[in-house]
């Protein structure tokens, strides 16, 4: 890293959607609206290259300001989150795996006003993949997870993450 001491961080170019897919956001895409806005075309292009996705997964982490990024050599590429920093897959045995492939142990279950189910784990906070909500319901019915209700707007503050590092940067620069 000392070889490239002044490499600027990258904001607004990478997004993680609510299903655990990565998206590249070029200038044209960014001009259409924020990644999480739902505006047509604002999500950008879904990454398909498996080795690139694996590289992102291996280097995906959080800074001291609760902003998620992946370390690309000397540069941090900050991630725009559609929902949460992690997207969980739940196995039939109620095992939990992050979109990054890492196993996780649920510590808390949360349900928002829209019925979306989240887990807080030792890795961090994340949304359960929509395809796995029926399995999550079984875990709740079995008493393995006891959900608490929370409003979507309160999730980032309560669980310590920034959904849009790019927007935070713009706010700080004003």
Q: Residue spans of the language-model regions?
A:
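Short, extreme N-terminal leader segments that mark the start of a protein/domain
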Residues: 1-23
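Surface-exposed beta-loop interaction hotspot
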Residues: 84-107
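Short, exposed beta-strand/loop patches in secreted or surface proteins that constitute
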Residues: 15-16, 59-61, 86-88, 106-111
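Glycine-rich, aromatic-bearing surface loops/beta-hairpins
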Residues: 97, 105-174
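Acidic surface patches and DE-rich sequence motifs
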Residues: 6, 17, 26, 91, ...
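Residue-level detector of beta-strand structural context in well-folded domains
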Residues: 12, 66-68, 107, 117
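Charge-rich alpha-helical segments
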Residues: 7, 76-88, 131-134
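Short, well-structured hydrophobic secondary-structure segments
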Residues: 21-25, 32-85
């Amino acid at each position: 890293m000392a070889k490239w001491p002044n490499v600027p961080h990258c904001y607004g170019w990478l997004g993680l959607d609510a299903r655990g897919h990565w998206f590249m956001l070029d200038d044209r895409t960014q001009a259409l609206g924020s990644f999480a806005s739902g505006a047509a075309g604002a999500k950008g292009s879904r990454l398909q290259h498996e080795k690139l996705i694996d590289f992102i997964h291996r280097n995906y982490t959080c800074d001291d300001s609760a902003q998620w990024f992946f370390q690309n050599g000397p540069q941090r590429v900050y991630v725009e989150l559609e929902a949460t920093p992690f997207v969980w897959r739940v196995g039939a045995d109620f095992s939990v795996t992050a979109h990054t492939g890492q196993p996780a142990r649920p510590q808390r279950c949360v349900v928002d006003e829209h019925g979306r189910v989240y887990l807080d784990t030792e890795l961090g906070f994340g949304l359960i993949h929509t395809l796995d909500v029926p399995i999550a319901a079984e875990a709740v019915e079995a008493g393995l997870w006891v959900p608490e209700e929370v409003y979507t707007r309160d999730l980032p503050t309560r669980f310590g993450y920034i959904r849009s590092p790019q927007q935070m940067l713009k706010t700080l620069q004003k």
